[in-house]
Curated annotation (Swiss-Prot):
Major localization listed first in the record, in broad terms: nucleus
Stretches in topological domain Nuclear: 42-43, 106
Family note: Belongs to the TMEM18 family.
Annotated GO biological process: fat cell differentiation
Organism: Xenopus tropicalis
Transmembrane stretches, start-end: 21-41, 44-64, 85-105
Region (DNA-binding): 106
Coiled-coil intervals, chain numbering: 112-136
Name of the gene encoding the protein in the UniProt record: tmem18
Pfam families: TMEM18 (PF14770)
Membrane topology (Perinuclear space): 1-20, 65-84
Protein name, as recorded: Transmembrane protein 18
Compartment(s): Nucleus membrane
Length: 136
């Protein structure tokens, strides 16, 4: 039985010229988005803006795909943008959605931490009230 090819093998076999400047730029863009996602953990307003910007970009992917399909000759050696939008979904939207998922997971984690802290404070207040009642 044949072994399943790995992700890198599939990427190498794909008819995509990964050395095209715009694809390198797209990769750099996604790396920068990941860095901003990490840095934004320290700044809630930055994180919200970054999250919303990525959601808007994913929402506009269909329009970006149509525009790129009409003008691909001006920046690319071959046409990657088909009517189904598979390439833009994988190369553009999926990494952005991964970043948004990271942010949502961070928000859930922070919420759980705050809820735990709140419950701990409630328990401490309850215990201190009970101690005061016993003293009276």
């Amino acid at each position: 039985m044949a072994e399943d090819p790995g992700l890198w093998t599939l990427l190498e076999r794909a008819p995509i010229d990964w050395k095209e400047p715009w694809l390198i730029g797209l990769a750099v863009f996604h790396i920068l988005c990941l860095i901003v996602t990490y840095v934004s953990f320290k700044s809630y307003p930055l994180q919200i803006c970054h999250f919303l910007l990525m959601v808007v970009l994913v929402s506009c992917a269909e329009y970006i795909n149509e525009f790129a399909a009409m003008h691909w000759r001006s920046y690319s050696k071959q046409q990657y943008f088909d009517s189904s939008g598979m390439f833009i979904s994988l190369a553009f939207s999926a990494p952005l959605l991964c970043n948004t998922i990271i942010i949502v997971v961070h928000w859930v984690y922070k919420t759980l931490c705050v809820m735990t802290e709140l419950k701990t404070l409630q328990q401490k207040r309850k215990e201190s009230r009970e101690k005061r009642k016993k003293k009276e």
